[in-house]
Amino acid sequence: METTVRKLKEEMQCMLTGNILPFWMNHMVDSEYGGFYGRISGIGERVPGASKGVVLNARILWTFSSAYRLLHKDEYLKMATRAKQELITHFYDHEYGGVFWSVCEDGSPLDTKKQIYALGFAI
């Protein structure tokens, strides 16, 4: 049993560090407007003008923060910091508190409603 669990852990870590995290670092970083692209097509192309959602951004923050905490790679810290900055700069409502549900591609507020679901991820 211990061998099976160890093997599964190794496979999952390999998938995470060899595929999942590199995909986000290499294909989803929005170098024009900051943060990460809101959407890509089924063939991996950016969808211009796609909105960005707070839940996805918060999940990216959690994922890269956790990856850095466990694996201590500076590139993961850089991505976590990028996601945190996006959350604070564009999703956080500096006037009334809480987080916007979504922002436009350029980071301007789009759907300004406050949902407890989104707040849970942002916290």
Segments from the language model and where they lie:
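Glycan-recognition and catalytic cores of secretory/periplasmic carbohydrate-active enzymes
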Residues: M1-I123
